[in-house]
Amino acid sequence: MSRKESRTQAFQTLFQLEMKNSDLTIEEAISFIKDDNPDLEFEFISWLVTGVKDHEVVLDEKIQPHLKDWTLARLLKSDRIILRMSTFEMLHSSTPQKVIINEAVELAKQFSDDDHYKFINGVLSNIE
């Protein structure tokens, strides 16, 4: 399956982990999707989910300066996860920033409120 579908599953896994207040391990959360989606890139999903969880503080420090008059705590959980996930990928992969931002916008259109994709696009476009 595509990277796009794998990013969607990584997003859903991170959302699930945040909803469960980390009672679930990353491996347990990923195992829930393995049975239903054997063709996904689980190595990529695991790398992305683990990277976001392990680097949350650093990612938040990178994102926060670009949230004009907002704090990460005030954002929707979905927006916060999309920003962290995309920032991690921009900092730690060779995938072009444009591709990562486009995927983030698509995730926001699917999982966030109506116009939040514009906000996601604006924040990520300013992260280096």
From Swiss-Prot:
Pfam families, A to Z: NusB
Domain of life: Bacteria
Keywords: RNA-binding, Transcription, Transcription antitermination, Transcription regulation
Gene Ontology MF terms: RNA binding
HAMAP family tied to this protein: NusB
Family per similarity comment: Belongs to the NusB family.
Name recorded for this polypeptide: Transcription antitermination protein NusB
Organism: Staphylococcus saprophyticus subsp. saprophyticus (strain ATCC 15305 / DSM 20229 / NCIMB 8711 / NCTC 7292 / S-41)
